[in-house]
């Protein structure tokens, strides 16, 4: 019995210590999981199982949930807009020879009077198949996303709504910019960090 009295406190301390260790190994944070992925990707690169570009894409994909829309969007002052008052030719001439895939559409040519957005590819298909059609018939409803949302949340929104662009809003619901699937791809490819 004296041996039990002597060992009991030691056994209780060891039990609590082991329980604490066990808890520490199972309760990983999101950043721990991301670091595990990055370590595995770097190990695969070191073993020459993947190339430099693949390593970069995988690391950026693993950290997508930590990146905010605000870091990848086109700021308000740089957003180019289709003006609903102008013809298709006038809009394209105004925007210049290098077009993006999509543009917000506005009643007055500013971000303050938006009516939706337009996909340039659809404009050209319509122009080829029925040139007399009005380009405004192709205006799509525009999505909105909070600038503090993660890029993973943005991609989920794009997939759920089957859209490729969104307006970026601040906490006061003021438009701060424009973001497209292309902007997210640039982050994934490492062209924008």
Model-derived regions, located:
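Membrane-embedded alpha-helical segments of inner-membrane proteins
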Residues: 1-43
């Amino acid at each position: 019995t004296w041996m039990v009295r002597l060992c009991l406190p030691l056994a209780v301390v060891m039990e609590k210590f082991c329980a604490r260790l066990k808890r520490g190994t199972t309760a990983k944070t999101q950043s721990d999981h991301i670091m595990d992925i990055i370590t595995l990707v770097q190990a695969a690169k070191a073993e020459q199982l993947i190339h430099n570009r693949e390593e970069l894409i995988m690391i950026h994909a693993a950290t997508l949930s930590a990146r905010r829309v605000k870091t990848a969007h086109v700021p308000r002052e740089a957003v180019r807009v289709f003006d609903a008052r102008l013809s298709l030719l006038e809009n394209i001439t105004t925007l210049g020879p290098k077009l993006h895939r999509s543009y917000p559409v506005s009643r007055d040519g500013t971000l303050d009077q938006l009516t939706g957005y337009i996909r340039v590819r659809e404009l050209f298909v319509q122009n080829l198949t029925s040139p007399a059609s009005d380009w405004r018939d192709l205006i799509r409803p525009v999505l909105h996303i909070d600038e503090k949302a993660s890029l993973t949340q943005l991609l989920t929104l794009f997939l759920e709504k089957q859209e490729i662009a969104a307006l970026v809003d601040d906490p006061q619901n003021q438009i701060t910019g424009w973001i497209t699937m292309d902007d997210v791809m640039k982050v994934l490819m490492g062209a924008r960090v």
